Amino acid sequence: DEPDGVPTTQKQ
């Protein structure tokens, strides 16, 4: 998944 701090989409 994406690393925290690099939002690809709005992941809440």
From Swiss-Prot:
<protein>
    <recommendedName>
        <fullName>Pseudohemocyanin</fullName>
    </recommendedName>
</protein>
<dbReference type="GO" id="GO:0005615">
    <property type="term" value="C:extracellular space"/>
</dbReference>
<comment type="function">
    <text>Does not function as a hemocyanin.</text>
</comment>
<comment type="similarity">
    <text>Belongs to the tyrosinase family. Hemocyanin subfamily.</text>
</comment>
<comment type="subunit">
    <text>Hexamer.</text>
</comment>
